[in-house]
Amino acid sequence: MRKKNYKGRITKRYLPKCNDICRTYDPIMTAYADLLSKREDIDEYRCNVYLEGLTEGDYTTDFLIKKKDGTFMVRECVYRSRITKPIHYKLLELSRSYWLHRGIVDWGCVINEKK
């Protein structure tokens, strides 16, 4: 989950199941986008989906994914070292409640592997 107008290093790529140009901001997002493109149960996905109506600010969710069975799932990418920090916890909880309010219960975090 990032600010809508995030100013940082960005990688832009065309990927098979992504509806638009896939913009990734870190290695976790890049690796997960590649994984989604290879999975057979995924129909399509969108990166950096704007969370409209948040009073806390303008934020985007990392991945909104549509499966072949028509259900949706949401994934947020976060580094293991940052997941326990209060601001990141607050933002992840905002994302989870935002999507739960819209009927998407399959919400989760993508975390880098333990070293």
Task: Kindly label every feature range from the protein language model.
Residues 1-115:
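Electrostatic, structured charged patches in enzyme active sites and in nucleic-acid/phosphate-binding
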